[in-house]
Amino acid sequence: SIISKNLTTPLPFFRAKKHMSEIVLKLVRMINTRHFDKNFNQIDFSKIKNLLPYDARLSDNFFKQIDTKYEKIIGINAFSNNSEYRGFNFFIKDWIGLARQLSLKYPKFLFILLNFSTNSIQYNIDQNANLKVFCNNKNIASLVSISQKLDFLITVDTGNLHLCDILQIPTLAFTSSLAAYRFGGGSYGGRFDKLIVKPAWQKEYRKIYEI
């Protein structure tokens, strides 16, 4: 694996403080250094979003059921296997609470809780006028479509973050310090901000519900 500590390359290099894009590009450069150096500056990374697969059927059906025209569409993604495993995520009920508070404070904005059909956790909430749940299928092209509709994304560190980064959707990510410098966004011309959470911070967080 390219992210493994045991990864070996033809030319060894120090990876501890490098962004993953730097690591990958350095490996690509090793294939043909002359060709890379001649052509790399001609790449416009802001246009990579045009190469993504796109399927609007699911998102079109979703928005057909919403009659109101909102000023902004905000996506909220609470799910990440990596964040759960490492203890960097909030409880789902707190994500729901955040979404509800935001929807009440900003009635002219549409807030969408993002989920996927194969997730073992599904939202069971009372959806109001400007708080909805979008459940994606297994098609990455459908996720691209709904992501393109967003004006802003609030998320834990997961694939949605990187997809919206490519699409240049402004994003606020709850992430670890390691993931922040290794996989931090903003490389494609968009805006990316982060809130760093420390390892095992959930131990103190859980005490709130034990009192």
Short names for language-model regions:
Residues S1-I211:
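Catalytic machinery of carbohydrate-active enzymes
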